[in-house]
Amino acid sequence: MEISKTLLLVVSLVAATCFLQAKAAGVYCSNPYTRCYRKYIQCPEECPSTTAMNSKYKVCYADCDRPTCKSQCRMRKPNCNRPGSACYDPRFIGGDGIVFYFHGKSNEEFSLVSDSDLQINGRFIGHRPAGRARDFTWIQALGFLFNSHKFSLEAAKTATWDNEVDHLKFTFDGQDLSVPEETLSTWYSPNKDIKIERVTSRNSVIVTIKDKAEIMVNVVPVTKEDDRIHSYKVPSDDCFAHLEVQFKFFNLSPKVDGILGRTYKPDFQNPAKPGVAMPVVGGEDSFKTSSLLSNDCKTCIFSESQTEIESVKSKIEYAALDCTRGASSGYGIVCRK
C-alpha cells in the first residue's frame, strides 16, 4: 500500500511538472522587422505548443506584428478565407481583405509578389474545354528568389490522386532536394535563410523565408465533386494536382508589386469590382515572367544588387500605419481592433 502511494505521488508530480512546462511555453519574436521584436509571448493553455504531430490540432502562434503582442491558437494549414491566401482556380484574398480572381494562362508563370529583395512567382496549369473563351487554371508551383538563391516547390503531375503518396517536389539553386516524409521533419538552406517544415508526412509544408515571409502550402487535386460543380471537364490522365497557399509577409516595401503583393501597398486601389460574385482581375502581360525563377516581368522590381535594394526600401514607421482601409494597411500587417 505504501509503495502504491509513493508511486501515485511520483506520477502526480511528473504530470504536474509536464503541465507547468506546457503552460509556460511561449514564442520569442526574433524578427527585427516586427512590432514585438525581442518580446517573449506566452502561449494559451488551449494550445501550449508551437508544433503538433497531429495536423488536426491547433498550435500556438504569435503574430509578432500585432500591437497587442499576444498569441492565439491556429491550424498549421492554409486558411483560404483569410488575407494572403491563393487557392482554388485561383482565388486570391489580398492584404486589403478584398477577394479577387486572376486566371492567367495555362503553362505560364506570373509574378505573385515582387519586392526589392524578394520575388515569388507562380506557375499556372490547366486546360480549356471546347467552347470556352479562357483556360481553367490552378497554381501548380511557386518559385522564390531571395538572397542570391533560387528555391522552388511544386505539385507533381498525377493522373489519379493518392493521399498516401507525397506529391511535393523541391529544388534549391538548381538542385533537387529531399525532405524526409515524416511529420515535423525540417530542411534548412546552408545559411538558414530558408526553412521547410512538413506539417504532415505528405503534401503539407510551411516554408519560412527569414525575416520576409511564411508560406503555408497544401497539395490537393481537382476532385470529382469540383469537376461536377464547375464543369471543368478534367481529362482522365491528369487530376491537376495544385497548391493551396497562404502567405504572411514581413517588412514589405511601399513599392511591392505582383498579383498579390501590390494589395499590400499603403495606397493600393484594388481594381476588383465590389459586389460582383467573382471579381476577375486582368493584367497578365504586366505580371508574366519568362520562367518560374525569373524576375523579368514588366512590374517586377526584385534586384540582387544591394545598392538597388537600399534605394527602393524605406523604413516602416509602425506608428503611422493607417488601419482605416480595412483588413490591412500595407506592409503585410493585418489591422484588427
PLM regions and their residue ranges:
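N-terminal-proximal low-complexity accessory segments that begin disordered
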Residues: L9-S12, P44, D89-P90
